[in-house]
Amino acid sequence: MEKVDTTWRIFITYMLLLVFVLFCGNAFGQIKVIQFNAGWNKANEAPWVVKLEDCQTIGYIDIATDKEAQKEYKIAVIPTIVIFKDGDEVARFQADLSFKMVATREEVQEEINDQLMSDF
């Protein structure tokens, strides 16, 4: 009997599985986070936004220099953190009257987790 080399078959199977997992992760339930602030309010920025897990942090938009973004996203107070799922806004966290972010990293992360779990 001839021995069949199954190494390549296993490799191809794992590669197809990896491609499928990556595709599903990118195609469904994509969470993005944007922090809006202004240069003059840097002291009240939420630096922990970049440490949020299971989401893509788009970054920081300075509404003092990007008035179009302020208008488009209806930013009334800064800092503001907006969470998007599949391109739609699903949550917003805003500062208090002293321009300080009230929400904690844990609260924002919990919202991200809730949004991810809502797909199941």
Which residue stretches match the model-derived regions?
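Structural micro-motif
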Residues: 73-84
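Bacterial N-terminal signal peptides that target proteins for export
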Residues: 2-15
